[in-house]
C-alpha cells in the first residue's frame, strides 16, 4: 500500500524537489504568472493567502459569457468519459443560467399499471412478494424506476395490500386491460403521496452501455435559473435530444458543475428542493445523454480561500486589492470586486481555472489508477498538493512570507522573478511600504522566509513526502 501512495506522490508532483530553477509545475508560481500576464502587471508583489491541508477547492458559477462546447457521438471513451470529482460550491448572490438535462415531472399525476404474472394462480388473492413476480411488460419510455408499490390481486380488482410488496420496476399505461390472473399495482393513493423525479436520459437504454449504470444527477443550486438564456444551454439541449449516445465537453478552463444525487427534488413532507450542507457539486469535463440527469451549469474551478493582494512598487503608498480569486464571492466573469476599483479579465479567470483543473485531473487520474474512492481520497490529495506547492515556494525562496501571505515578485519585464538574490534585494521595498509600528515585525518575517543556507534544500524531499502522505496513512491500514 505504501508503494502505491509513493507512486501517487510522484505522479502528482513532477517538479524535481532539488531544483530551484524549474517552477513551471508549481501551482503558486503558475497562479502568479496567470495573474501577472492577464492584468499586465510589472514591478509589483503578488501576495497569496496560504493554503493549508484544511483548505479545499471549489468552483463559482459563471454568467454573461460565450462558450463553445465540443460535441461527439457514440459511447464515451477515454477523455470523454464522465468521471465525477466532488467539489465545494461557492455561495452565489447572483442567478446564473442552468439547464435541466432531463426535465422533472410530478410522478403522482401519472396513472400507471404494473402487470406481473402470479406464481400461485389458484389462490383467492394472489399476493406478489418480491421474487415471485414475472415481469411481462416493458417500461414506458422516459419514466424512471419508481419505488416499491403495494401489490395484490382479487377477482374484484386491485386493492391495497400493505403486507405483500413487489418492486415496481416497469411502467406502462394499459388502462383498457383487466388484471386477468395478474398482479397489478394499486392505482389509489400511494404511501408517498407525491414526488417529483427526473426523466431518464434519452439514450439510457443503449445496448452497449453497462446495465448497472445508475443515472447521475440532482438539483444543483438555489442560484440556478432555468429561464436565463445561454448559447451553450440551447446547443446542449438540442444535442442530447436523441436516442443515439452523445457526449459534450467543455473547453479548457471551464467545467460542467452538476447537482449530486444527495440533493433532492420535492417529495411528500419536503415541498421544497433540499440541498446538501455544505453545498457540493459534481465536476465533469464531459457529460452524456446516457447516464446524466438533473441540473447542470458551467463554472470555473479554483482553490477555496486563495486571496491575492497586489502591492505596486511604483506607487509606494498605494495598495491595489484585487480580491479573492475564484473563492466564495460568487462572482461572474467581469464582475467588479465588492471592495472596488478592479475588474477581472475573463482570460485571467479562465486560465486560473484551467490550471486548477489540470491539477484536479492529475489527482483524479492517479486515484483512479489505484481504484480508490475518488470523492474521499482525491480531495485529501488535492488539498495536500496545493499546500505542498506553497511550502516548496516558501522554502525554495521564490515567495517571501509576510504575516499569513506568500508574496511573489513580478519584475520589470512582467515575469515571475525566480532569482533568490534579486528577490532578496526587492523585498526591501516591502520593508519601506510597511514603515510604522509594525515595520520591524514585517521585516523580520520577510527575512526569516528567505533561505540563506543551501543545506536546507535537500531536506525538502522527505518533508514534502511526509506532508503529502501523512493524512493518508490511516487509509492503508
UniProtKB/Swiss-Prot annotation:
Signal peptide range: 1-21
Membrane disposition: Single-pass type I membrane protein
Record carries keyword Membrane: yes
Record topological domains on the Cytoplasmic side: 343-477
Protein name listed in UniProt: Endogenous retrovirus group V member 1 Env polyprotein
Gene Ontology cellular component terms for the protein in this record: membrane
Positions on the Extracellular side per record topology: 22-321
UniProt-listed CDD domains: ENVV1-like_HR1-HR2
Subcellular location: Membrane
Tissue specificity of this protein: Expressed in placenta.
Xref: InterPro entries: TLV/ENV_coat_polyprotein
Name of a matching Pfam family: TLV_coat
Keywords of the record: ERV, Glycoprotein, Membrane, Signal, Transmembrane, Transmembrane helix, Transposable element
Membrane-spanning parts: 322-342
Family according to the record: Belongs to the gamma type-C retroviral envelope protein family.
Carbohydrate-modified residues: 68
Presence of keyword Nuclease: no
Organism (species): Homo sapiens (Human)
